[in-house]
Amino acid sequence: MYQERISRVLAAMERMGLEQMLVSDPDSIWYLTGYDVFPFERLYAFYLRKDGQHKLFLNKLFPVPEAPYEQVWFSDTDDYLAILANAVDGEKDMGVDKDWPARFLLPLMAHNPSCKYVLASDCVDDARACKDAVERDLMREASRINDVVMERAAAYMKEGMTEREVADYIVAQYAAEGCDSTAFLPIVSYGAHAADPHHEADQTRLKA
């Protein structure tokens, strides 16, 4: 599954004239490798190459991935950008994704001034947008579970309940249906809160 996804990204890179790309978005790296970690402020990148010699750049604080790619480890005290710069081809155009922080990109550009950097997020984003059969089945199952949980939540709500009570109930129902987690605390909004598209459930009580 992951190799097929990588192959689609490599094909898109080839259409852009790229032989290498640095993927830094954690969700995109998870999509391509199955390795799930959130790096916060630390460098984290998956280096894709046309020849298949891919590399995963990781801080030693991260768990060891089960991924069949060369792993390049570093610590907070290492010159990790020099390590990265020396591992890539500094003479060929480099694709980068749209979310890579300037604190990483600018030093890399200084290390390899002969390299042209190209915004190449579409190579990964377009692959992620085109769902395969497994993903479509997972989406259908997620939608089914969501329908079940929303029906339970509607039946559960009573006058006097707080937004947070209902939100916590919804989370518990997703867990009961086998979900690992929710992307965020469910949005439960009473009254004027309904005008806030990203409202965080609080202690406001439901009034009839």
Positions of PLM-derived features:
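A composition/biophysics-driven feature that prefers long, compositionally simple stretches
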Residues: 1-148
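Short alpha-helical functional segments enriched in proximate histidine and acidic residues
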Residues: 12, 156, 173-177
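Short catalytic-site patches enriched in acidic/histidine residues
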Residues: 29-39, 124, 161-208
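Short helix-to-loop capping/linker segments positioned immediately adjacent to catalytic or ligand/cofactor-binding
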Residues: 95, 153-161
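Active-site pocket-lining segments that scaffold enzyme catalytic pockets across diverse folds
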Residues: 144-153, 163
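Charged, amphipathic alpha-helical interaction segments
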Residues: 148-151, 158, 175
